[in-house]
Amino acid sequence: MQTGQALRLNKFLAERIGISRRQADDLIAGGKIQVNGKTAQLGARIDNTCKVCYNNKTIPFETSYIYLAMNKPVGYVCSRRQQGDSPTIYSILPKQYQTLKTVGRLDKDSSGIILLTNDGDFAFQMTHPKFVKEKIYEVTLDRALEPLHQQMIADFGIDLPDGKSKLGLEKLDEARKSWRVYMSEGRNRQIRRTFAAVGYQVEKLHRVQFGKYQLNNLPAGKFTEIEK
């Protein structure tokens, strides 16, 4: 950041301590953030000449950006908090990566590549629809996909409550149960809901690529640092 260049305090907190902007606003509203020795106010803007403190500790402005790719195992959730008996992917990560935020998500029953970073601009560019980042999945259905349903999904799209869903499909086996699925959107459980709308259950959903980042041979439950 250039000297004197202003940014919103909640964005700064979200990027530096690994929380959402809403959580950052809660900290500010609760009087837990100080700027230059004074209690910060909602909507405040700061620059790198300011001293920002939380829990009596100064939060540095300059940070080294980290980018991770993880092969998320089935059964793990992408949130920071454990949900019921389901462990979180953060239980896999060592302490130095605990403040990283996920770039998009995979549901508990899905596996494959998930990205994590402390670079908010990178996360935005990877997830905002205007940047069109293709994601590739390997999907196994409970039965053979009928050619008519293949055409409906790939050529015309399926009407879902949150809009039309159109997926690229590539057959992976002669039984027509295994498919490579291409999509650039990221709606919640979109692939599962699309197939369910025409009568199929997704038995396996595994993401192998997110934008230019590929899973390659990374084992389940392992992670590696990547370059932006």
Where are these regions (language model features)?
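Basic, flexible Lys/Arg- and Gly-enriched helix-loop patches that mediate nucleic-acid binding at interfaces
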Residues: Q2-K228
